[in-house]
């Protein structure tokens, strides 16, 4: 008996420390497990690979290096392991320069050369080339790492510039068709083909009218049917990969019609420019973060009213545009924005969310030279492993600084709760209720023996559990040394860094008595897994 008490007391050292001197606020989450309010794709988490060459610069900084599809070091063991850790990570190949990429296959009318800086090119660059030798290398890498590939096609090929940003003329699909034929002949698996990048509406540097775009999607669909006529499965058609304008998007669905466009994609950079001095303030402002909800609701409504056959994806989202915010996007603080937006978007039936970028800029999930994961990488990996497809409704008595999102757990019973504490001074003690009874209590309500009390508070690391009390898993995320701009994230107090053998570290929870309270420290993030929560919608 005495020995057991000593063991329990020793294990108390594993508990995430409650921040002393902070305010304490008790709150209850009321979770409706009877129905799903929305649903994501099985592979909701996605990351992009861009085309930017090393000469891409913003604000006198050039943060891309060798991070493009054309020059990325595919021989890096850590890069491969970072993707393999997801088992099935969707990778969207695309970006600003995709509508200037020529595929070096078939009968080309002009030489296929690499991107060069030029004053008269879109985004300050000439056309670029994807050589088939490189395409072979990329596909061997994707096959070895289990990646699910979405490829962004050049939608300006054959067109001519009219005036301003407008481009006209028919899309020349021959280069795309030759490229697809080569891809199929090699047996390379492409899950989906995306048409164009940021050409919708008024565009960024270039735009195509919705009338032309709708017509071209029908052409693309027929090209895919022809190229894949002997294939058991056919890739999805994805478009337009632009910034949402309700009228333009609605018209695109109407003009292309049922059975053509499978996925409607839009881009988000709601934090503004990467050099905004108020970037951190925006990330920590719950009202600012919530402002994006209307956009997701409008996209969802547009699909329901004008194209219920299509799914909504976020095709590209980096938080801050122009390569992200230096010493912000690659640090712990960015996970407040990133995870919160994953939560908001999923509540509005967003099926896939592609983060800009896997590598490159300041917003890369991986450091561009070493491929060492940045904090958002681990946030994405935890979401991918823990958060299932089904989203449940949740109400809370807490202030707006405590963000709560609830999903069915992934490939297991019960639910997973994502809690984000944006408060600088308040520790939240969280109880959970299914609307009928309190499942987790914010404080102990009945007298227990000393040993029972210790057992309900203690936390275990790994799979160890002494009895039925110990069946709640917690993943508490915080920055190293309390520095929100640290590039090192702590999981339950332990630094998340590659192992001595160059592997992605294990993401192990602490386990608590299911009836003990959940503590969420100021400026921290937690995933809470409740395998015994009764949620019929998750069956």
Swiss-Prot record:
Major localization class: membrane
Subcellular location: Lysosome membrane; Secreted
Listed Gene3D superfamilies: Glycosidases
InterPro entries in the cross-refs: Glyco_hydro_79, Glycoside_hydrolase_SF
EC numbers for this chain: 3.2.-.-
The protein's enzyme class: hydrolase
Keyword field contains Membrane: yes
Pfam families for the chain: Glyco_hydro_79n (PF03662)
Active-site residues, record numbering mapped to chain: 198, 316
SUPFAM superfamilies in the cross-refs: (Trans)glycosidases
Membership in a protein family: Belongs to the glycosyl hydrolase 79 family.
Protein name: Heparanase-like protein 2
Native source species: Arabidopsis thaliana (Mouse-ear cress)
